[in-house]
């Protein structure tokens, strides 16, 4: 799968693949990356996906967009990411193995759900951003190891984004995170989440000012 910049001139490498854009972030021309083509999903595939676990479904979808990571490795990354141990903060009566359990508010006479809430905040930081960030951390570690490279990530946060990023990257080989946060402007819970981390590759920097400064 090749990717294109929204501004039309991605630069080098021409038409990069997933691993290139994973480490590069924005395209050299300042645009965002989009797939060169969008995969088609058949009705049979959709029906088959209904019976998959969250990790299996993530692999099935991601494998259509990530073709430069061997399927066996990508499947292992998904299985490592989406586990009951990582997404363990479920409501009473919930099953952490579901990763994103549905809390049904209404059911019909046959007991089938009609109106439900999808829980996305069962990860390490209780933020929905854990859903993507945990996968991103494992992908970063995998690709950097394959290439023999390291990366420094400079981020700025006003709360949950920074926490989710740090908890996803903590302990990851080849990754160092430098996170700017507004001194005294975050909740006590958010400060405790971020500033209590003792990992050697996580650096919290509290600065005077706000996120938009």
Segments and roles (model prediction):
Residues 1-213:
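PLP-dependent amino-acid enzyme catalytic core
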């Amino acid at each position: 799968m090749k990717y294109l910049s929204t501004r039309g001139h991605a630069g080098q490498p021409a038409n990069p693949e997933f691993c290139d854009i994973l480490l590069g972030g924005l395209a050299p021309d300042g645009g965002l990356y989009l797939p060169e083509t969008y995969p088609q999903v058949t009705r049979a595939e959709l029906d088959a996906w209904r019976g998959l676990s969250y990790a299996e479904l993530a692999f099935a979808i991601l494998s259509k967009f990530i073709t430069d990571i061997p399927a066996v490795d990508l499947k292992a990354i998904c299985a490592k990411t989406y586990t009951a141990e990582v997404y363990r903060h479920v409501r009473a009566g919930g099953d952490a193995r579901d990763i994103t359990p549905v809390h049904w508010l209404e059911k019909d006479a046959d007991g089938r759900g009609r109106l439900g809430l999808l829980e996305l905040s069962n990860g390490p930081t209780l933020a929905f951003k854990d859903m993507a960030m945990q996968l991103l951390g494992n992908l970063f570690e995998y690709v950097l190891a394959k290439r023999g490279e390291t990366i420094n990530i400079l981020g700025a946060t006003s709360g949950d984004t920074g926490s989710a990023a740090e908890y996803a990257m903590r302990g990851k080989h080849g990754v160092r995170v430098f996170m700017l946060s507004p001194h005294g402007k975050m909740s006590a819970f958010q400060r405790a989440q971020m500033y209590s981390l003792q990992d050697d590759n996580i650096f919290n920097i509290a600065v005077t000012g706000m996120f938009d400064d």
